[in-house]
């Protein structure tokens, strides 16, 4: 700060500066500085009001007064012409000074007089930077309320939030007094809410409860004024709470009609669904909110949508009357919508004698009114159909408009003729006392006025305001009504104009000459034959006229060219012809309306599309300052999206509107950028907002899965940060880089770990995410972890060498099997257990995202014996340990006191003496024996160390001569099979090199398993159905310490969120580095590596009553009445059997097998 300005941002150096200028100016500056308003009034003149402190920072009097918070002086200076945007030497405006020193009232005053809240000084500091740096909370709020942009960066690239004092940070994150804001919305305290409301917190969510936004609360408590204010300030009508309820759900549930109307008028989705697929109409119908139901139906609510219980809103209606009303009004609104769109097929579907005169509950429109107003070409046919069915031709709306009024106002002359011929009352009056002629005259529809006059409409009727039709018309209409139709043109020209209008191409050919081709309608709008032909959609006439010299640029009296006419009435072929013949698409009439303005205002989607394709500028403004987008009617969302261009696609992707995305996306814009924000692509937004279907569609149509935004984030970062598992899995399927880094070297795994996204972490690790990568601060994902589950997951995945000591797992390792000598206890295994977590998986299928395998128990005698053999707890080895020390006589004490080996390692002399071992020598021998067992000189596994918790894991090395070793090895070797993928996932091999087999002993896990086995056996007629099965996973380390954990299972597996096992070791081998082999071994990234050691578990699994399944079935739990699922091989399904359990305690990791796959004989590298 000090390097870019005087201390105080201009104000504090005021005094010194004032001393160095001429006396008169110095006196004025001093008066402003001291707040002496009387002296200021005496000294200020128009010449001096913006004088400069030439000896200082070239500040103005307003700079001084603002910096010192002299509100009265500031007000006087502004009233007398002080320049609110004046800049000093450092580029500061008075607002900078006021903000820097926290003068909130002065800030308000300056902003009201037009001060720019985003003005930047020479270092790109805005007033918000100033206020934030100094911790001026009130000023920050005022600035944000007046449009200050918090994302602006100074020349150092820092935003206001980056530089903010701790006290102001909460304002810039939207967290400042969030609870008070939410309470004010709930209680209806407007003053309190407006004092706190900013664009940064208008959509904040409560930290507890239902995670409601202010709009949720205001809607639920019927705070109409609060709802209006929130909507005016950008509240999101689509915001969802914890149960996916939108504010409209709340308003409808409690029957708040006005709030409901406000929300739907601001675009709330009337068919939005919560987590249970309840729509707002479900809520209103179930609570018997009759009027709200009617309102929702009028805005397109569908009462046939089903919730999660397969119940529609009609089903939930508590009374027969409401059920009937819902069905009736739904049919009626469907008929009205079909009439608006002039859709003959849908009209015939919904039309009946009962429905033909259905009236809109709010506007009282009938289908005939809607058809009369329809811009579509089949409106005449629809009107005739309705009239044949008995539509009331003189029915009036709430404003007393008849169908004739509506058609006349729209200049739909074809409908005017139809309804008049069916005896419509031509002089019917609306609520303003106006006839159809009044409305046609007011809109300047000359031909409509002629038509109405010809049918006997009285031009002398006076409206309630005292006007006749003549008085309301423009010059042409007035002339028509006063004098009748004049024949100012020559008879030949008149006939040519009429022929062009009527589409009589033969007459046009006969009369058209070089002189007459561009003749004018003298009595009318000075239109040419091309104007008429274009406006009346006479394609063949237009084509002929253009070929014979018609001026495509000719303007009528209002500055309209033929293209204006064609676009206004939606004549696509004509417009296309005119453009091909050189019509200027950005030409403007006298009111600066372009053809795009006309087409947009009239809802002509295809015309808008054509014009934009040929270079029409959607940013051009008419005389009223409106762009084409500003003129689009509320219901024309397709045109709004078209005109918004890339912004509409980004919005649709963000809101998850698949239909809009399909309509708006193309190969040219599928990777467009949010240029006003983070330069996100549609895929970034779809991923961040969990819009799975949209993300999938974008990826299928060329979206760049690894596109980076301004911060270097790819879509996978967004999905990972917000915990969107399904979206993340989809992105990975389309080859998203799981180790991509942003500008701060954060990977998706950093994001997921920091936010406690357990499922996401499991998914990323399973697909090759590297947990050792560090961000710019030198932090791994484990350093940022915020949840215990995530911590356990990352710890299991980290190579032991990369783990901090506090995270290293603890285990007793190197214990020999019974029968080993005493020396063996002091010489542990020479090769370490490679319990490192391997890379990734292609699909998450089970616990910790691993798909597991199993060994067939029917293969060998050894397997059968293994299944029958009980696995004792840790205490089985205490007898052998004591015997090896020659202290067998102490076993009675150990058995009496229930001392197991894991308890013994925690005991010292005092504890041993207390249980009755009085001889010092015996105690010493026991303690030293334990020390030798666990000391670093025993060749302990570098990945596993002592756990002193009393519930740790002991790994017991089996001797290759041991029958148990040989039985397990035989199971491994005999269950190798050739797989359909040709070795892609698990490598190319036909046998293993078994390096080590260790028995896993964990008393806690064993007791948990046996308890569950007993439960299953009791539930299955005393038959546990226990099997010895293989399990492959990159998380072996976590499993042998903590057991299997179904909480980390992912629903994306073939049989849902279970833990998977297999009979064949080669199948489990496919998953030791992740699903599909992940990225291969950690060192060589090779799925067929013959060097690196692998590890597999041979597990005891209780299957109980198993459900046989041949095809994929997504389940979160075992099928009812069953304990597991058995996936059987089939022609188009599995090649080898799979076994799935859904509770981790149904399996015990009995053997840890360390091995290598062996290269087949005769196979060469490459």
UniProtKB/Swiss-Prot annotation:
SMART domains linked to this entry: ANK, SAM
Tissue: Highly expressed in placenta, skeletal muscle, liver, brain, kidney, heart, thymus, spinal cord, lung, peripheral blood leukocytes, pancreas, lymph nodes, spleen, prostate, testis, ovary, small intestine, colon, mammary gland, breast and breast carcinoma, and in common-type meningioma. Highly expressed in fetal liver, heart and brain.
Record PTM (3S)-3-hydroxyasparagine, positions in chain: 203, 271, 427, 518, 586, 671, 706, 739
The enzyme's E.C. designation: 2.4.2.30, 2.4.2.-
Residues the record lists as (3S)-3-hydroxyhistidine modifications: 238, 553
One record GO biological process: protein auto-ADP-ribosylation
Residue ranges of ANK repeats: 57-89, 90-122, 123-155, 210-242, 243-275, 276-308, 363-398, 399-431, 432-464, 525-557, 558-590, 591-623, 678-710, 711-743, 744-776
Region described as Disordered: 819-839
GO CC, alphabetical: chromosome, telomeric region; cytoplasm; cytosol; Golgi membrane; nuclear envelope; nucleus; pericentriolar material; perinuclear region of cytoplasm
PANTHER family: ANKYRIN REPEAT DOMAIN-CONTAINING PROTEIN 39-RELATED, BRCA1-ASSOCIATED RING DOMAIN PROTEIN 1
Name of protein: Poly [ADP-ribose] polymerase tankyrase-2
Organism: Homo sapiens
Lineage: Eukaryota, Metazoa, Chordata, Craniata, Vertebrata
Gene: TNKS2
């Amino acid at each position: 700060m000090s390097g870019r300005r005087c201390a105080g941002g201009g104000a504090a150096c005021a005094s010194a500066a004032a001393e160095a200028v001429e006396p008169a100016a110095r006196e004025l500056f001093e008066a402003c500085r001291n707040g002496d308003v009387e002296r200021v009034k005496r000294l200020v003149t128009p010449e001096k009001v913006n004088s400069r402190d030439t000896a200082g920072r070239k500040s103005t009097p307003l700079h001084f007064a603002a910096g010192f918070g002299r509100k009265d002086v500031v007000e006087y200076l502004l009233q007398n012409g002080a320049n609110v945007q004046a800049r000093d030497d450092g580029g500061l405006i008075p607002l900078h000074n006021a903000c820097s020193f926290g003068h909130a009232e002065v800030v308000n005053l300056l902003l009201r007089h037009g001060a720019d809240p985003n003005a930047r000084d020479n270092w790109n500091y805005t007033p918000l930077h100033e206020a934030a740096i100094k911790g001026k909370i009130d000023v920050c709020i005022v600035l944000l309320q007046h449009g200050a942009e918090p994302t602006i960066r100074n020349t150092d690239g820092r935003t206001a939030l980056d530089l903010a004092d701790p006290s102001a940070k909460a304002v810039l994150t939207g967290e400042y007094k969030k609870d008070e804001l939410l309470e004010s919305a709930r209680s209806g305290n407007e003053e309190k809410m407006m004092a706190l409301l900013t664009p940064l917190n208008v959509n904040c969510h409560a930290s507890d409860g239902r995670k409601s936004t202010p709009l949720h609360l205001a809607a639920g408590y019927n705070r109409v004024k609060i709802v209006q204010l929130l909507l005016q300030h950008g509240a999101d009508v689509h915001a969802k709470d914890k149960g996916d309820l939108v504010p409209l759900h709340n308003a409808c549930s409690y029957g708040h009609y006005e709030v409901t109307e406000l929300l739907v008028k601001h675009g709330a989705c009337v068919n939005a669904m919560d987590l249970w697929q309840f729509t707002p109409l479900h809520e209103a119908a179930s609570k018997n909110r009759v009027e709200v139901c009617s309102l929702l139906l009028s805005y397109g609510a569908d009462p046939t949508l089903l919730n999660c219980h397969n119940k529609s809103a009609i089903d939930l209606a508590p009374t027969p009357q409401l059920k009937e009303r819902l069905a009736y009004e739904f049919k009626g609104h469907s008929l009205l919508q079909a009439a608006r769109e002039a859709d003959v097929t849908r009209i015939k579907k919904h039309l009946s004698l009962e429905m033909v005169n259905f009236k809109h509950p709010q506007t009282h429109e009938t289908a005939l009114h809607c058809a009369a107003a329809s811009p579509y070409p089949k409106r005449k046919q629809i009107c005739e159909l309705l009239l044949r069915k008995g539509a009331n031709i003189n029915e009036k709306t709430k404003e007393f408009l008849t169908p004739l009024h509506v058609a006349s106002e729209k200049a739909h002359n074809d409908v005017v003729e139809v309804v008049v011929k069916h005896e419509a009352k031509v002089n019917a009056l609306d609520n303003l006392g106006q006839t159809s002629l009044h409305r046609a005259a007011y809109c300047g529809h000359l031909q409509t006025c002629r038509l109405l006059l010809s049918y006997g409409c009285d031009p002398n009727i006076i409206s309630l305001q005292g006007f006749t039709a003549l008085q309301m018309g423009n010059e042409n209409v007035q002339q028509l009504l006063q004098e009748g139709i004049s024949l100012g043109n020559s008879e030949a020209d008149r006939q040519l104009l009429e022929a062009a209008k009527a589409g009589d191409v033969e007459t046009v050919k006969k009369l058209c000459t070089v002189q007459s081709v561009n003749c004018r309608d003298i009595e009318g709008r000075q239109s040419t034959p091309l104007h008429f032909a274009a406006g009346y959609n006479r394609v063949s006439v237009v084509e002929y006229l253009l070929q014979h010299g018609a001026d495509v640029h000719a303007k009528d009296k209002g500055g309209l060219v033929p293209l204006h006419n064609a676009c206004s009435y939606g004549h696509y072929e004509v417009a296309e012809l005119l453009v091909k013949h050189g019509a200027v698409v950005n030409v403007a009439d006298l009111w600066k309306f372009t053809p795009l303005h006309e087409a947009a205002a009239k809802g002509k989607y295809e015309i808008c599309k054509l014009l934009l394709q040929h270079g029409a500028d959607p940013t051009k403004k008419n005389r009223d300052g409106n762009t084409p987008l500003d003129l689009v009617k509320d219901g024309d969302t397709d045109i709004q999206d078209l005109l918004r261009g890339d912004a509409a696609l980004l919005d649709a992707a963000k809101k998850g509107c698949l239909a809009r995305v399909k309509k708006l996306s193309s190969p040219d814009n599928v990777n467009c950028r949010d240029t006003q924000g983070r330069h996100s692509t549609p895929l970034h937004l779809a991923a961040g907002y969990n819009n799975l279907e949209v993300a999938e569609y974008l990826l299928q149509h060329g979206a760049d899965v690894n596109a980076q935004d301004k911060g270097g984030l790819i879509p996978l970062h967004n999905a990972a940060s917000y915990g969107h598992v399904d979206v993340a899995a989809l992105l990975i399927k389309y080859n998203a880089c799981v180790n991509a880094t942003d500008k701060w070297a954060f990977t998706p795994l950093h994001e997921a770990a920091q936010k406690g996204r357990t499922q996401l972490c499991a998914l990323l690790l399973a697909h090759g995410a590297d947990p050792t990568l560090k961000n710019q601060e030198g932090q791994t994902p484990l350093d940022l972890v915020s949840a215990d589950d995530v911590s356990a997951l990352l710890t299991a995945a980290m190579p032991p060498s990369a783990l901090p000591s506090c995270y290293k797992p603890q285990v007793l390792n190197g214990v020999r099997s019974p029968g080993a000598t005493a020396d063996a206890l002091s010489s542990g295994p020479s090769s370490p257990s490679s319990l490192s977590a391997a890379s990734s998986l292609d699909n998450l299928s089970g616990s910790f995202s691993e798909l597991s395998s199993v060994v067939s128990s029917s293969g060998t005698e050894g397997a059968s014996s293994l299944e029958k053999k009980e696995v004792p707890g840790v205490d089985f080895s205490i007898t052998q340990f004591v015997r090896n020390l020659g202290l067998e006589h102490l076993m009675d004490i150990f058995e009496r006191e229930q001392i197991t080996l894991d308890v013994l390692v925690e005991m010292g002399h005092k504890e041993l003496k207390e249980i009755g071992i009085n001889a010092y020598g015996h105690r010493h021998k026991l303690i030293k024996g334990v020390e030798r067992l666990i000391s670093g000189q025993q060749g302990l596994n570098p990945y596993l160390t002592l756990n002193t918790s009393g519930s740790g894991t002991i790994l017991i090395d089996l001797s290759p001569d041991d029958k148990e070793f040989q039985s397990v090895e035989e199971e491994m070797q005999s269950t190798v099979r050739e797989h359909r993928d040709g070795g892609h996932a698990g490598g190319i091999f036909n046998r293993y090199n078994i390096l080590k087999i260790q028995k896993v002993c964990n008393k806690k896990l064993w007791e948990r398993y046996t308890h569950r086995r007993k439960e299953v056996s009791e539930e299955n007629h005393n038959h546990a159905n226990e099997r010895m099965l293989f399990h492959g996973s990159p998380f072996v380390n976590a499993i042998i310490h903590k057991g299997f954990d179904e909480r980390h299972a992912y629903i994306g597996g073939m049989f849902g969120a279970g833990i998977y096992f297999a009979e064949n070791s080669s199948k489990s081998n496919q998953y030791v580095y992740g699903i599909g082999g992940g990225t291969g071994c950690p060192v060589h990234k090779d799925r067929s590596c013959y060097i690196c050691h692998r590890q597999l578990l041979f597990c005891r699994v209780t299957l109980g009553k198993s459900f046989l399944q041949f095809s994929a079935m997504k389940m979160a739990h075992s099928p009812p009445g069953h304990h597991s699922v058995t996936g059987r091989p089939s022609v188009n399904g599995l090649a080898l059997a799979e076994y799935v359990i859904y509770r981790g305690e149904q399996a015990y990791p009995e053997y840890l097998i360390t091995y290598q796959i062996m290269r087949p004989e005769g196979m060469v590298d490459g």
